[in-house]
């Protein structure tokens, strides 16, 4: 039985990096929500409720500095410090205001693409066109109000791909895209997301020519994935496409090869700094609180004083027994974690943060 959800080995290998970068760039709330994934629990063998509560406090006090996300935004801004020049023929003028059919212009798609490259090393561009009868002239084309759209795809949503040699050229012959469609509930207000897979193929026809096909897979009542009827897109002349209108976009080149995301080293250091912060804030919490003590007293004095109330401060008289004394104990500050934080902070600045 074929499995449309099968994931390319390179996808499986790189997915943890992409998810880590997404969490780190999203900020403190996303990182802390992952709990022990990014902040190991001290005394992890202790599964008691008390240790669980202690860990929650340990995580809450920790500070995650959103260095990686800020750096990503700064780099995108630097890339577009000078407005890029887009040149479109009149038939594609809509790309300047609505390139993807959802209101994003080509300029905004380019900005999002740079952001994907920084976080995931790559993204993808996929060109689609509504299923309409091919227009015979420009007037008919305008009446249809059907425009080609450019879809920018996150690397996480392209789960599988393959290529083959055709006429001494390497061409993509398979692309599997994970998609989510929205379905409104019967009440007219609620909404749920439904997962589906769009499969782009390059398949031989009866004459041995390779043509582009599209097939969408949805989950049936029995929980199995079922492919809908294949569609055979055609160009303006009604001819089948001889290639898949899809391309990977990489930080270095546009090949299928995946390399480490540019921001990964900074994200790893950002998380290490977060763990040091948890240890430092823990020491600040405990060592920053003085502990009062009394000596030369017995339990009878303590019980009587507790009954009447023990007050410490200016203009307050605290009766003590003969040879009694009151003092304050405070631990020496632990600066090791603080020094580790400073060291990592300097290294992050060296990386361009």
Which stretches of residues belong to each language-model region?
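N-terminal start-of-domain structural block
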Residues: 1-43, 212-255
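Intrinsically disordered, low-complexity segments enriched in small/polar residues
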Residues: 25, 33, 67, 75, ...
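Short linear motifs in intrinsically disordered
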Residues: 113-117, 128, 163-166, 199-206, ...
């Amino acid at each position: 039985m074929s499995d449309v959800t099968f994931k390319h080995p390179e996808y499986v290998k790189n997915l943890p990096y992409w998810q880590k970068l997404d969490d780190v760039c999203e900020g403190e709330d996303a990182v802390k929500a992952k709990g022990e994934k990014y902040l190991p629990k001290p005394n992890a063998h202790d599964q008691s409720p008390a240790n669980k509560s202690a860990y929650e406090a340990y995580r809450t006090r920790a500070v995650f500095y959103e260095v990686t996300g800020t750096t990503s935004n700064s780099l995108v801004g630097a890339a577009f410090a000078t407005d890029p020049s887009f040149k479109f023929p009149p038939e594609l003028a809509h790309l300047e205001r609505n390139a993807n059919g959802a209101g994003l212009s080509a300029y905004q798609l380019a900005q999002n693409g740079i952001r994907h490259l920084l976080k995931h090393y790559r993204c993808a561009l996929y060109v689609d066109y509504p299923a309409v009868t091919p227009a015979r002239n420009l007037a008919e084309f305008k009446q249809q109000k059907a425009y080609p759209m450019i879809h920018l795809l996150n690397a996480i949503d392209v789960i599988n791909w393959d290529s083959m040699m055709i006429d001494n050229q390497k061409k993509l012959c398979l692309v599997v895209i994970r998609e989510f469609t929205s379905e409104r509930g019967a009440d007219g207000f609620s909404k749920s997301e439904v997962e589906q897979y769009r499969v782009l193929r390059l398949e031989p026809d009866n004459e041995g020519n390779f043509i582009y096909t599209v097939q969408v897979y949805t989950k049936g009542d029995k929980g199995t994935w079922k492919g809908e009827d294949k569609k055979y897109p055609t160009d303006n002349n009604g001819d089948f496409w001889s290639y898949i209108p899809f391309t990977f976009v990489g930080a270095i080149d546009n090949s299928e090869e995946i390399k480490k995301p540019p921001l990964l080293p900074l994200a790893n250091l950002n998380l290490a700094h977060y763990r040091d912060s948890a240890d430092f804030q823990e020491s600040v919490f405990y060592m920053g609180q003085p502990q009062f003590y009394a000596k030369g007293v017995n339990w009878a004095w303590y019980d009587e004083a507790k009954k009447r109330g023990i007050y410490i401060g200016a203009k307050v008289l605290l009766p003590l027994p003969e040879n009694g004394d009151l003092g304050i104990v405070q631990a020496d500050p632990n600066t090791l974690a603080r020094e580790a934080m400073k060291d990592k902070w300097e290294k992050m600045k060296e990386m361009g943060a």
